[in-house]
């Protein structure tokens, strides 16, 4: 029905393109008029356009500076500050409107300017990544359309070879005229450096500065690169710099500017594939115990072996039953136990390809899944642990707990989580415990829960490592380290680690050194990082299938740009085989046939293991070929360049799909172009489309086909009953192949099912991170305020005013002046003891005022004694150090909360709602602690003597060594980056500061004289 409407009224994309056409015509007319200008006149035209945009923005920028200066006044009243902030917000909105209007009016001239510049650069020789290049690019009309779409903050889908990199220069140049900085985001450092050097001639012609952020750069160099008009870099580098800026000790250490406009290359890879895991900066946990996995590893290995033996007996039982009764329910139950016990068992996977077996397992499973899987325990109870391969979860059964208990000579209860709610209620309801004893008992319950939950978590992670993660598939082992392989690109993700102890579990399994445990110092999801940009756009060859997610999460529309020349590639239906062995044999035969013909072939694989299997089979046939996978990626550019030559055979994991064009060699067009042979379907349709897109660039011929077997991961986990039943009905023999559009569509439906599941995972992650994101905004805003303000005196006094009200109310009812005195002395080092009579209801405000005045006077005396620059350091240190420490502690608590929150579902509670409530409670507590400790430090910090400075310096050096070990990681996979010390650098060596609790008047003087403080150094205090 939708296709009929599109034929009559035109598709959304057709309408989008139609609206842009008049602007394209105008651009071409202006560009034609520019051809008569000299190079110098063309440069002057560019300068004039820049001045026109800047002249409209400068007055507003000046107003913003003047208002910001007023906020710096330490004596400003809160009401005046609120009014100025409101004016700044209104001015910001006006600034954005004026910017958008100025750029919209300049767009035709700027795009024409860039096009004419490209025309003049034709034939120009320059270096890109050490190789000689000749500029041969001038934007086509379809590329101008792509540029307009990007400028409007949308995603352009452009086919491979259509020149997306050149397209980006158009909106980048236009938006760079504002002087606010434009970020171009790529998927790796190589592409960031390459694209910067490749496109630089266009920008350099007009004096625009271009920078690039690379993994190895120091902060000073990064800052210079961010100050450029255009900055290239990876999503990880931009994200980690944002987190590090919010851990900086001084304004000078911060490297980034505001987030104005970003264009994300390969936007589906960055905003979707990478979005399932957050960016994390972590540091080592002091005194962490890394032996916990080694301790339980022998038990788990024994447990896994016992499960394998149990599964083998189930397979034998099933085979016996099936000989007499092909559809026997007990045989189906035995096979279902195999699926739940060892889903990757090769014998079981082979059995699934036999007629009727897959359907029998599916129907048996459906029977036990009825009524919310209430009967599934009957299947699992016979196993030691149950595996849900789709969900990636493992549950220890009662039988497994008893087995571990026997192995470890420990009580079975040690492998069970206590019912905290019931036990706490029992303690609360007991009359035999005093209040102090109840607190002690409850602490013991919480401790028991924490110990057992950590033990069970470690067991679960080791079981996952042995049951769900296979070497040379999900990861490889190189140089004694476990390295994750990106499922979408096939590349090794250097420096990335699986989260929640899973990586350590795999290290224990592989007998390599177990890396130290880490704790989160700062974190943000890819989604929430990119949602900070005022304007965001993206480009890719494959976005349409994910259009709904782009809009729902990022509010980004997708526009499909027509190709410059029609795509003539032939995309054939899938070829379906029963077993992997049959499929691999067919792949090798097809490759042999194509090589003899002289037609180049690219064989796409989904894992390192498959690429190596096919390579061995081709070597056995003496077929010369290249392999490109996570283990052999050092020749990537060279291998890709050769892949389109006559008779070339290239086996590649998904890594050959990004940022590379395969150009056809001489005589290859006549042979049919590049032949794409997919060895299996990926779980994402986008990855398959990327593989197909390697062929047929710029009107070149090409062919593509996928070879699929029923043993493939996708078919085994998500293949529909319809496909299975069709295969069974046809009853084809070994080696037979099925080719039908219905099968291809069924496979695509299975892929859609996986995509929807992955979308729900990403969306759920975002829902959880949105809670933390709001808290992060509050904390980072407070921290930046503390970092950027010269004086924080007024903020300290605001905190003091609130403190006085709260602390006086606390002791109002009991009129306990002594307790009030003790607390104020302990927290502020201020002596204050009101008379009992002053505590009546009418004078509570008066007591608070008197306390404020006493503390205020103390602070003023301190200001007179301490040099002003040191006082500023004290205030800044008090604010920043407390925020940093408390925020780290808060993140650790949030991590713990997040790990256990899903257990609330067993109590018929919504985990997300529970998480929001608990996280809010923790955040309120965090703010209260930050305010109190900041105030306390500001009052109690005093300069120290030179003798004491030495000890402080030693401690700071130790701290600096610790912070050097901070790791920036894209969780479950981002690169290890060294980090500058986040110890505040404002403490000069000759006069550092420390937290120093002022002695009481009757305490012994700390100088060691033996006299009371009031009779010794206390006499010198005002």
Curated annotation (Swiss-Prot):
What residue spans carry the region label Disordered? 973-1001
Q: What does it catalyze? A: ATP + H2O + cellular proteinSide 1 = ADP + phosphate + cellular proteinSide 2
Give any Gene Ontology cellular component.
Answer: cell envelope Sec protein transport complex
Write out the GO biological process terms.
intracellular protein transmembrane transport; protein import; protein targeting; protein transport by the Sec complex
Keywords attached to this Swiss-Prot or TrEMBL record, sorted alphabetically, are: ATP-binding, Cell inner membrane, Cell membrane, Cytoplasm, Membrane, Metal-binding, Nucleotide-binding, Protein transport, Translocase, Translocation, Transport, Zinc
UniProt topology in membrane: Peripheral membrane protein
Task: Tell me the HAMAP family matching this sequence.
Answer: SecA (MF_01382)
PANTHER family assigned to the protein according to its UniProt record, in alphabetical order: CHLOROPLAST PROTEIN-TRANSPORTING ATPASE, SECA INNER MEMBRANE COMPONENT OF SEC PROTEIN SECRETION SYSTEM
What protein family is recorded?
A: Belongs to the SecA family.
Q: What is this protein called?
A: Protein translocase subunit SecA
Q: Which organism is it from?
A: Chlorobium phaeobacteroides (strain DSM 266 / SMG 266 / 2430)
